[in-house]
């Protein structure tokens, strides 16, 4: 019966990885568009970085 957890878990993990990558690409595209529209936006974003 252990194989049921693998049968359900692997596709779920793969779907989560794909959705995570799609979200990252969406956020990256938004940031690039914002930066292209306003080049000074990068300076404002640098102040929000936590080291």
UniProtKB/Swiss-Prot annotation:
The chain crosses the membrane at residues 4-26. It is an enzyme of class 7 (translocase). Induction: Expressed in stationary phase. Part of the cydB-cydX operon. One of its GO terms (biological process) is oxidative phosphorylation. It catalyses: 2 a ubiquinol + O2(in) + 4 H(+)(in) = 2 a ubiquinone + 2 H2O(in) + 4 H(+)(out). Disruption phenotype: Highly attenuated in macrophage-like line J774 and female BALB/c ByJ mouse infections. Loss of viability in stationary phase growth in culture. Increased sensitivity to H(2)O(2), acid pH, highly sensitive to the combination of NaN(3) plus NiSO(4). It is a single-pass membrane protein. Pathway: Energy metabolism; oxidative phosphorylation. It holds the Pfam family YbgT_YccB. Signal peptide: none annotated. May be a subunit of cytochrome ubiquinol oxidase. Belongs to the cytochrome ubiquinol oxidase subunit X family. This is Cytochrome bd ubiquinol oxidase subunit X. It comes from Brucella abortus (strain 2308).
């Amino acid at each position: 019966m252990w194989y049921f957890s693998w049968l359900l878990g692997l596709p779920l993990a793969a779907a989560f990885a794909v959705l995570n990558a799609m979200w990252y690409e969406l956020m990256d595209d938004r940031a690039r568009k914002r930066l292209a529209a306003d080049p000074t936006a990068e300076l404002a974003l640098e102040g929000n970085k936590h080291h």
